[in-house]
Regions:
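Cytochrome P450
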Residues: 1-392
C-alpha cells in the first residue's frame, strides 16, 4: 500500500512519512537506521557507544569524576544497571510509588478543577517532577521551583554555535544553572541522605562514594530522562484521548493492563525520543551496509516503530496489541533497546495512567487551545506547549 494514503493518526510528526530505506548514509557522513531488524541488532550489539542526550553538557560539569550511568558501556554499565534496577521493577514501582502518584495526581488535578483551567504540559511536568524527585531523592530543596530549574538545563542558551561572545555567554549561563541546581536542590538532598539514607538513587550513589559533583551529574541525567520526557508523554496521550471521545471511553472502561497497552501504542506512534545516537567503536555491518569505526549512527525511532516488518499493516494507525512481547513489545523502540533501554519504562506508563484516569474523569474536560507542536533538541523530538484545558 502506498504510505501516502495510509491512515496517519499521529499528532507530532510534522507531516513527515517515515522512509522505508533501512540503512543509508547522508551527505554529512551520518548513518541513518530506519529498519527494526537493523536497529535492534545495533542497539543490542557491543560495537557502539552513546552519543546523544546532551553528552557535551555533561562533559562541561567541572571535575565530574565518574562517568554517568547513561554513558557507561560494557561491564561497568551492566553493574550499575544491576544496582539501580531495584528502584524500577514493576513490583517496586507499584509498592513504593503508586500512593505517591495518586496523591500527586489528586493535587495537580484538584488545583486545575478549582481554577477551572490549566496548561496541560505544566500539569504534566508537575506530576513528572514529583514522581522522579522521589525516585532520585531530590526531595529536600531549599526552595520550590525544581521543575523550572530542571527545565532550564534544556532551554535555549546551551547550544553550540554563534560568535565568541555568544559562546562565552552560553558557557556562563550553563555554569550558573548547574550551580543553582546543585546548591538549591542537590546539596541539601545529599545532606539529608547522609544523615538518614533512604531507598532512592542519591542514597545509592552516596553509598558508593560518589562526590557532590558526581551526584549532580547523575541528577541532571535522571532529570532529563525522568521528568522532561514523561511530561511530553503525558501531554501527547492526553491530546489523543481528549480529542477522541470513543478512544477516551475505551480507555476509561478498560482494566489497567488494557489501559497500559493503549498508552504504549500511543507511545509507539508518538515516541518522545525521536532519535537514538550511537558512535561506532569498530566497523559494523548493518543491513548490508559497511559502517566504519568512529561513524555517527542515528536510529530513527519514528521510522523503526512504523516498520511494517514489526508493526504490521497500517503502522501509522492506532492498534493496541499489534506488537506482542515476543516480536518487539508494544512500544517497539520508544524506550530504546539493548543495554541502554530505559529502566523507568514501567514507572512512566504507570504514572501517566494514574494521572490520565484522574484527569479524564473531570466533568466538562475540553481543550480551550490544542497543543503547539515544537522541537526539543535534547530528545530530537517534539515538545508540546500552550495546551490549555478547561472544565466545568
Amino acid at each position: 500500500m502506498d504510505a501516502t494514503i495510509e491512515p496517519d493518526e499521529r499528532r507530532t510528526a510534522f507531516g513527515r512519512i517515515p522512509s522505508r530505506i533501512a540503512v543509508e548514509r547522508d551527505a554529512a557522513g551520518v548513518w541513518h537506521v530506519r529498519g527494526f531488524a537493523a536497529a535492534r541488532a545495533l542497539l543490542r550489539g557491543d560495537s557502539t557507544r552513546q552519543a546523544g542526550f546532551k553528552a557535551e553538557l555533561i562533559e562541561r560539569v567541572p571535575g565530574r569524576g565518574k562517568v554517568p550511568i547513561l554513558f557507561l558501556e560494557g561491564r561497568p554499565h551492566h553493574e550499575q544497571r544491576r544496582l539501580t534496577a531495584p528502584f524500577f521493577t514493576p513490583r517496586a514501582v507499584d509498592a513504593r510509588y503508586r500512593p505517591l502518584m495518586a496523591r500527586l495526581a489528586d493535587r495537580v488535578i484538584g488545583d486545575f478543577r478549582r481554577q477551572g483551567r490549566g496548561e496541560l504540559s505544566a500539569m504534566g511536568m508537575e506530576m513528572a517532577v514529583g514522581v522522579a524527585a522521589e525516585v532520585v531523592g531530590l526531595t529536600d530543596s531549599r526552595r520550590p521551583g525544581l521543575d523550572r530549574r530542571i527545565n532550564a538545563f534544556f532551554a535555549d542558551g546551551l547550544e553550540q554555535g554563534g560568535g565568541r561572545l555568544r559562546r562565552i555567554r552560553q558557557a556562563l549561563v550553563a555554569q550558573f544553572r548547574l550551580l543553582r541546581f546543585y546548591w538549591i536542590d542537590v546539596r541539601p538532598s545529599m545532606a539529608a541522605r547522609r544523615a538518614r539514607p533512604r531507598e532512592d538513587v542519591i542514597s545509592h550513589l552516596l553509598a558508593q562514594g560518589y562526590s557532590g559533583t558526581e551526584v549532580l551529574t547523575e541528577c541532571i541525567t535522571y532529570g532529563a530522562a525522568g521528568m522532561v520526557t514523561t511530561r511530553e508523554f503525558i501531554t501527547v496521550c492526553a491530546w489523543h484521548l481528549i480529542d477522541d471521545a470513543a478512544l477516551c471511553a475505551q480507555y476509561l472502561g478498560a482494566d489497567e493492563p488494557a489501559r497500559h497497552a493503549l498508552l504504549e501504542e500511543l507511545l509507539r506512534l508518538e515516541p518522545v525520543v525521536g532519535t537514538l545516537f550511537r558512535r561506532t567503536t569498530c566497523p559494523v555491518t548493518l543491513g548490508g551496509a559497511e559502517i566504519p569505526e568512529g561513524a555517527m549512527v542515528a536510529v530513527d525511532v519514528r521510522a523503526v516503530n512504523a516498520d511494517p516488518a514489526v508493526s504490521g499493516e497500517r503502522p501509522l494507525a492506532r492498534q493496541p496489541g499489534r506488537c506482542p512481547a515476543e516480536r518487539a513489545g508494544a512500544p517497539v523502540l520508544s524506550f530504546g533497546d539493548g543495554a541502554h533501554r530505559c529502566p523507568g519504562s514501567f514507572l512512566a506508563i504507570q504514572e501517566a495512567d494514574i494521572f490520565l484516569t484522574s484527569l479524564l474523569a473531570v466533568p466538562g474536560l475540553r481543550f480551550e487551545r490544542e497543543p503547539q507542536v515544537g522541537w526539543n533538541d535534547l530528545v530530537t523530538g517534539y515538545e508540546l506547549r500552550e495546551a490549555w484545558l478547561a472544565c466545568d
